[in-house]
């Protein structure tokens, strides 16, 4: 069972994601990036799911900390910013995925499952086979057409 950390200052979104992900994973929540960093120090997480715009440290700053200290931990960004350049920029910085608010729960679940598998493969030192790489590329936000 994967350990997921959900970070969002909006209690409704945070609790909705936690309830959804708790069906298949162990889930903890944090309402700020600062609380998330403390939880990351105390526990090991397989995936971090974070909002980008929060009071205090932003999700972008959290992404930087996670990439630096926990490079095998995928970070999924959830944001209301529908700018394709913004999404591509965060992916280039190292975010595993970029999901738009409002989001569909099945899309979040699929992204988390891919991130868990990605982390497992990184830890094992394996890579995606051809079919899996093609499927992952099909989900790449750089292919999105945001309107």
Regions from the language model: what does each represent?
Residues 54:
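Receiver (REC) domain active-site loop signature in two-component systems and cognate sites
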Residues 44-49:
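Active-site beta3 strand of CheY-like receiver
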Residues 32-35, 58-61:
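Acidic catalytic/metal-coordinating carboxylates
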Residues 11-28:
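Two-component/phosphorelay signaling modules centered on CheY-like receiver
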Residues 117-147:
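CheY-like receiver
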Residues 85, 103-112:
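C-terminal output helix
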């Amino acid at each position: 069972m994967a350990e997921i950390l959900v970070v969002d200052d909006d209690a409704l979104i945070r609790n909705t994601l936690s309830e959804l992900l708790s069906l298949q994973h162990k889930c903890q929540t944090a309402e700020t990036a600062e609380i998330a960093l403390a939880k990351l120090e105390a526990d090991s997480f397989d995936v971090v799911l974070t909002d980008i715009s929060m009071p205090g440290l932003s999700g972008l700053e959290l992404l930087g900390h996670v990439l630096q200290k926990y490079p095998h931990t995928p970070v999924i960004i959830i944001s209301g910013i529908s700018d394709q350049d913004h999404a591509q920029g965060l992916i280039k910085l190292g975010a595993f995925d970029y999901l738009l608010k409002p989001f569909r729960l099945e899309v979040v679940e699929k992204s988390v499952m891919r991130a868990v598998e990605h982390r497992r493969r990184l830890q094992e030192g394996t890579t995606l086979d051809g079919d899996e790489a093609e499927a992952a590329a099909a989900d790449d936000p750089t292919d999105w057409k945001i309107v």
